[in-house]
Amino acid sequence: SEMCIRDRFGAGSIGGYLAACLSKTNIDLSLIARGPHKKAIEENGLTLIKEGRSENFKLKVTDDPKTLDVQDYIFISVKAHAISNIVDSLKNIIGEKTSIISAVNGLPWWYFYKANTGTNLDNHHIDSVDPEGKIWKHLDPAKAIGCVVYPAAEITEPGVIKHNGGERFTLGEPDGSKSERLKLIADLLIAGGLKAPQKSNLRDEIWIKLWGNCSFNII
């Protein structure tokens, strides 16, 4: 299987942490990055500092998704406001069976997809999250897997990520089902040394994480 992680459009470090962990599995992994971070990973590999230990990972990295084949799994770990800026660049690597995992804080673009609210909000895009539905149109919500991110990490210098705590990436299908693809993604994360609980109502978890963000991010 092939997987790519779209990282570092803004000031992210979670994508690099994911890439380091998942590179320990048998997945064919590529990292999409840019600027000094991409250059450092190309030249020296990605260094992960965790629990006082430093480990280096040689990763395939590119700043042009067009150089990649169609992917089985795509992790998006850019800042939420940047997703609409990158969707055009991903279209060539999204295939019929591609799963897209949004490892991003905030309400996801697919939030009301198969939400079963019994109202006219079902399958409705949120304009404040996804103006004019651009993300919804380019990233088919049927391909989406929800992900709530708990690890904390930082880029201390280009190509170097320091893990500050947490290993849990909570996953869920928009319709709450326990699908085969959900299990496969969870198994991959677990094989990489991460925790990947599967939830039947991930929207509850999204709000719990948001309450935490609202309470503590200002401190």
Task: Report each predicted region and the residues it spans.
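Conserved beta-strand termini and adjacent loop/short-helix elements that scaffold enzyme active sites
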Residues: 32-34, 51, 62-64, 147-149, ...
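NAD(P)+-binding Rossmann beta1-loop-alpha1 motif at the extreme N-terminus of oxidoreductases
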Residues: 6-53
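Short, hinge-like loop/turn segments at secondary-structure boundaries
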Residues: 47-50, 117-121, 161-165, 214-216
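Rossmann-like NAD(P)(H) cofactor-binding subdomain of soluble oxidoreductases
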Residues: 55-58, 63-156
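Internal alpha-helical scaffold of NAD(P)-dependent oxidoreductase catalytic cores
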Residues: 40, 93, 130, 136-208, ...
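Short, small-residue-biased leader/transition segments that mark boundaries at the very start
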Residues: 1-5
